[in-house]
Swiss-Prot record:
Keywords: Ribonucleoprotein, Ribosomal protein, RNA-binding, rRNA-binding. GO terms for cellular component: cytosolic large ribosomal subunit. It holds the Pfam family Ribosomal_L14. SUPFAM superfamilies: Ribosomal protein L14. Belongs to the universal ribosomal protein uL14 family. This is Large ribosomal subunit protein uL14. It comes from Bradyrhizobium sp. (strain ORS 278). HAMAP family: Ribosomal_uL14. InterPro entries: Ribosomal_uL14, Ribosomal_uL14_bac-type, Ribosomal_uL14_CS, Ribosomal_uL14_sf. It comes from the Bacteria. One of its GO terms (molecular function) is structural constituent of ribosome.
Length: 122
């Protein structure tokens, strides 16, 4: 579960390395975000000559969370780190590559571009 002030890794090649959640979108009092949810992030660490720079405020899709993800068949999936993919205002990924596995729950939330770029879908 991601909430305000949560630090996340960036799972794409946009140039950002670490981001911090500053808002969970979807409702006035929404507190937590999970896989597939859109959050507003501030970039805390970035590489030189990247597409984004430190201090930028952008939207991101949460792609990995440490909290258990329960599935309808009773199975549970969990990741080691919290991670997100930066998106623009048209909900398209800023980067051209995605690093690491992503869960298939993203498909239900209509993030098909992220699914197609990911090397592995769990």
């Amino acid at each position: 579960m991601i909430q305000m002030q949560t630090n996340l890794d960036v799972a794409d090649n946009s140039g950002a390395r670490r981001v911090m959640c500053i808002k969970v979108l979807g409702g006035s009092k929404r507190r937590y975000a999970t896989v597939g949810d859109i959050i507003v992030v501030s970039i805390k660490e970035a590489i030189p000559r990247g597409k984004v720079k430190k201090g930028d405020v952008m939207k991101a899709v949460v792609v990995r969370v440490r909290k258990d993800i329960r599935r309808a068949d009773g199975s549970v999936i969990r990741f080691d780190r919290n991670a997100a993919v930066l998106i623009n205002n048209q909900s398209e990924p800023v980067g051209t590559r995605i690093f690491g596995p992503v869960p298939r729950e993203l498909r239900a939330k209509n993030h098909m571009k992220i699914i197609s770029l990911a090397p592995e879908v769990l």
